[in-house]
Amino acid sequence: MNNWKHNHVLDLSTFSLEDYKTVLELTTRFKDVHKSSSKKLPALHGRLIANLFFEPSTRTRTSFELAAKRLSADVQNFSVSSSSLSKGETPLDTILTYISMGADILVIRHESTNVPAELANYVDINNINTSILNAGDGFHSHPSQGLLDLFTLATFFNPNEPSTNSLLNKKITIVGDILHSRVARSNLWALTACGAEVTLCGPPSLLPEEFIDFVQNPRLGQNFDPINKRGSVFIKRSLKDALKNSDAVMTLRLQKERMKQNMLKDLDSYYAQYGITHESLKWCEKKVPVLHPGPVNRGVEISNRLVEDNSINLISKQVENGIPTRMALLYLLGLNKKD
């Protein structure tokens, strides 16, 4: 793992193809540990990992906690409801308290974009030996989700040896609230870097023309590797057109808490036009897996029947793979810590 250069994990835009390979290889190894009878390794024994979630979370926070414990780390979970924030303390002062307590890794989720990046900058400027791991900031980035989705798809396409090449030339369609989705952005970086062709689909209000600026980022898609032309991104408005010849489909939750008024006509109309169902999947012209990062709104972005059809959806696999993926990230960051 000597090629790992990151002191923080903030955004997958900074990842090289070698970084993705490293994470996938480690995740494969840690998945075996996670499934073993002992379930634990002493890799991060004595390290302190603090989970600071300033935004509600169930799956991600629990997944990070289990991942840290599987590596034998000491874990502290921050709760907004029982914190000094209610007494007027700022989030920065709360975070600095954990740094003063000797936290080796801070796992941070915040509703505002770039909070983890600003904290990482503060840590670096002040030469503090603490790593920052972004667990989701606004609708900017969610790197661990992008990586676990990458691993889930790589494992589906190549169960015996999941790798970055498992995604090469695969057609992945992402449907839904792209505008407000940090998951979509992280998946775009990961999937295109590994050579996938990604199609985005959603109503104009949730996939506006301005998003094309993100898609045309000079480091995204085929521009990431101009020699091998790895990856590409397309935008389509018609669900039927978007699903045609897809190898996998990811549907996203409508983030109503982030939406402005009148961004959607109504939920029934949205479901009729963009809902993923057994019937709409026929447009793929073959049996394909369906992913959803959760939480799921049944009957809005995905049918109730499809949520319960484990022969098609990989939702439980995504949750399962979240633990070894986050073990890999914590392990890599923990390796850089000085005693």
UniProtKB/Swiss-Prot annotation:
* Binding-site residues for L-aspartate, renumbered to this chain: 87, 182, 253
| PROSITE patterns named among the record's database cross-references | CARBAMOYLTRANSFERASE
| Database matches in InterPro entries | Asp/Orn_carbamoyltranf_P-bd, Asp/Orn_carbamoylTrfase, Asp/Orn_carbamoylTrfase_sf, Asp_carbamoyltransf, Asp_carbamoyltransf_Asp/Orn-bd
> What reactions does this protein catalyze?
carbamoyl phosphate + L-aspartate = N-carbamoyl-L-aspartate + phosphate + H(+)
Question: Which pathway is recorded for this entry?
Answer: Pyrimidine metabolism; UMP biosynthesis via de novo pathway; (S)-dihydroorotate from bicarbonate: step 2/3
EC number(s): the record gives 2.1.3.2
Which positions are tagged coiled coil?
none
Q: Name one Pfam family in it.
A: OTCace_N
- Enumerate the UniProt keywords alphabetically: Pyrimidine biosynthesis, Transferase
- How does this chain assemble? Heterododecamer (2C3:3R2) of six catalytic PyrB chains organized as two trimers (C3), and six regulatory PyrI chains organized as three dimers (R2).
Do you know which PANTHER family this protein is assigned to?
A: ASPARTATE CARBAMOYLTRANSFERASE, ORNITHINE CARBAMOYLTRANSFERASE, MITOCHONDRIAL
Q: What does this protein do?
A: Catalyzes the condensation of carbamoyl phosphate and aspartate to form carbamoyl aspartate and inorganic phosphate, the committed step in the de novo pyrimidine nucleotide biosynthesis pathway.
Concerning NCBIfam families, the annotation shows: asp_carb_tr, PRK00856.1
This one is known as Aspartate carbamoyltransferase catalytic subunit
- Which species expresses this protein natively? Prochlorococcus marinus (strain NATL1A)
Instruction: Please name the taxonomic classification of the source.
Output: Bacteria, Bacillati, Cyanobacteriota, Cyanophyceae, Synechococcales
